[in-house]
Amino acid sequence: MSIASVASVFKGEHAVGSTVTVRGWVRTRRDSKAGISFLAVYDGSCFNPIQGVVPNSLENYDNEVLKLTAGCSVIVTGDIVESPGAGQAYELQVTAVEVTGWVEDPDTYPMAAKRHSIEHLRELAHLRPRTNIIGAVARVRNCLSQAIHRFYHENGFVWVSTPLITASDCEGAGEMFRVSTLDMENLPRTSDGKVDYDKDFFGKEAFLTVSGQLNGETYACALSKIYTFGPTFRAENSNTSRHLAEFWMVEPEVAFATLNDIAGLAEGMLKYAFNAVLTERMDDLQFFAQHVDKTVIERLQSFVSSDFAQVDYTDAVEILQKSGREFEFPVSWGIDLSSEHERYLAEEHFKAPVVVKNYPKDIKAFYMRLNEDGKTVAAMDVLAPGIGEIIGGSQREERLDVLDMRLEEMDLNKEDYWWYRDLRRYGTVPHAGFGLGFERLVSYVTGVSNIRDVIPFPRAPRTANF
């Protein structure tokens, strides 16, 4: 006898006739008139539960097995047999059922057999992993995460842990969460009435990071190829299906790289990750295709087999203006492309993933390399059919004088970035990188449209339960 996951049984890793023990939770119980009960037991290792055929000859059949309800935790031992029914290859002829946890009141158990709206499940974030949809999201999320780590490891990158607490604003946007140990009811003040952060824990204002990029650049300028993968925070008061206050970012940074180099890196990473999901999590994808978005499998297969198109921002604006389409937001040179513009380019014009490059400098961050025309920067966005922007990146400004000019243009104090400027003073090097919002990637792969449903415990305006 051995402990087995449900997934390992379905994969045929245990011989027919062998005895295994499966530990999990009851999805359903069905009783027959012949004195047999059928337990569907899941353990989260794969989408489908395994069926256990329980005879009434078990000692605890009447007083325990017949009282099992959805959500009860059990340890089931039995012999693996080929299933005569459709839908699964194997089932268990059960020889023992041990109940480890009862559902106290089955009538009030929120995750009982009835269906709940995904909106209602957000209010039950501690229990929603037990549902088919959130369990499948969690497995796909894990698969994508592992694939991204493998991709960078196989390509010689070093994973760098960048700080979550910072004193700098990478985006220059100012929408940051402040970190402080000051007494909010008795704040120390300077002579001009401002909060005296000299008295705070760090001796200065501190924030939760909006990006690991600036810190990542320091390591790329020593280790050549690095990536970060961790949580980031934005105090953006947006209550939409596309925004979270806490989310995860993948941010590679490569020394001696150009914008074209990282565009190629982005394409390689996305295709590698999508291939992993198609190979490893087809059971979950089939559920999403049946119940959430019928195009998910076809979309991923098309993505990995497509060559990425590339277009300059200026040319993209011209394409949009000549499209004959009446957009909600009018198109003109200098605007930041909206989701409707991005999706038109990817879904209708190019009919493929597309990299838009060389954006106007006035709508991009200070650290992006100024192009020779003086009007644009070496920035890129990767647009995917079905969602729009999925990656944003740039070649970084490696020239100190130009970086200082850009900081001044954006009213940022260059002394706050003294250490970042040092990289340009001591052996500066061209380098480039990008950021991938991980939850947006999970949303794209699963077809689950609200980003709050692809992260375990969403943080958003007025939402910080659990």
From Swiss-Prot:
Enzyme class, broadest EC rank: ligase
Signal peptide coordinates: none
Keywords, comma-separated and alphabetical: Aminoacyl-tRNA synthetase, ATP-binding, Cytoplasm, Ligase, Nucleotide-binding, Protein biosynthesis
Enzyme Commission number, as recorded: 6.1.1.22
Catalytic activity: tRNA(Asn) + L-asparagine + ATP = L-asparaginyl-tRNA(Asn) + AMP + diphosphate + H(+)
Top-rank lineage group of the source organism: Bacteria
Record-level Gene Ontology MF annotations: asparagine-tRNA ligase activity; ATP binding; nucleic acid binding
Predominant subcellular localization, coarse grouping: cytoplasm
Any one GO BP annotation for this protein: asparaginyl-tRNA aminoacylation
CDD domains: AsxRS_core, EcAsnRS_like_N
Subunit field text: Homodimer.
PANTHER family documented for this protein: ASPARAGINE--TRNA LIGASE, MITOCHONDRIAL-RELATED (PTHR22594:SF34), ASPARTYL/LYSYL-TRNA SYNTHETASE (PTHR22594)
Family label: Belongs to the class-II aminoacyl-tRNA synthetase family.
Name the UniProt record assigns to this protein: Asparagine--tRNA ligase
Gene giving rise to this polypeptide: asnS
